[in-house]
Amino acid sequence: MVDKRESYTKEDLLASGRGELFGAKGPQLPAPNMLMMDRVVKMTETGGNFDKGYVEAELDINPDLWFFGCHFIGDPVMPGCLGLDAMWQLVGFYLGWLGGEGKGRALGVGEVKFTGQVLPTARKVTYRIHFKRIVNRRLIMGLADGEVLVDGRLIYTAHDLKVGLFQDTSAF
């Protein structure tokens, strides 16, 4: 049985990483340090820009986050690839929320644009995922557009984020 709520706490997300939230066959989020969100504040099967589902999540920023110490020394900035990975994480999480089973794998993105950055002085990153299509056949796949905001300002956009759930990843 899927634990299908409209919001999830940090502990819930950590439980997902241990395989406890969506069952033994459901997709898992990564564990810290690669878990790129502190909470999911909204999940719906409708809504978003295409009325096919919406997820909103947040990451609290503080200067002690691991990536600021190494990217870059003297010029700390959150790597843009981590924001992109967070969006893929949320697409996979949504597929598990819908009841999908399998191991989540990012399959690509059509276009990504960076128009800003996350600095250690920021307070909060918000991720918004707008689902365009869910494929539920032999392969379960989500297709979505995403946005990353820092302190309410749009800084990244991603079009055609793709994540699939696989029963067997040995040939992937």
UniProtKB/Swiss-Prot annotation:
Its main location: cytoplasm. Keywords: Cytoplasm, Fatty acid biosynthesis, Fatty acid metabolism, Isomerase, Lipid biosynthesis, Lipid metabolism, Lyase. Its EC number is 4.2.1.59, 5.3.3.14. SUPFAM superfamilies: Thioesterase/thiol ester dehydrase-isomerase (SSF54637). Pathway: Lipid metabolism; fatty acid biosynthesis. GO terms for biological process: unsaturated fatty acid biosynthetic process. It catalyses: a (3R)-hydroxyacyl-[ACP] = a (2E)-enoyl-[ACP] + H2O; (3R)-hydroxydecanoyl-[ACP] = (2E)-decenoyl-[ACP] + H2O; (2E)-decenoyl-[ACP] = (3Z)-decenoyl-[ACP]. It comes from the Bacteria. GO terms for cellular component: cytoplasm. It holds the Pfam family FabA. The active site is at H71. It is found in: Cytoplasm. GO terms for molecular function: (3R)-hydroxyacyl-[acyl-carrier-protein] dehydratase activity; trans-2-decenoyl-acyl-carrier-protein isomerase activity. The keyword Transcription does not apply. Belongs to the thioester dehydratase family. FabA subfamily. Homodimer. Necessary for the introduction of cis unsaturation into fatty acids. Catalyzes the dehydration of (3R)-3-hydroxydecanoyl-ACP to E-(2)-decenoyl-ACP and then its isomerization to Z-(3)-decenoyl-ACP. Can catalyze the dehydratase reaction for beta-hydroxyacyl-ACPs with saturated chain lengths up to 16:0, being most active on intermediate chain length. This is 3-hydroxydecanoyl-[acyl-carrier-protein] dehydratase.
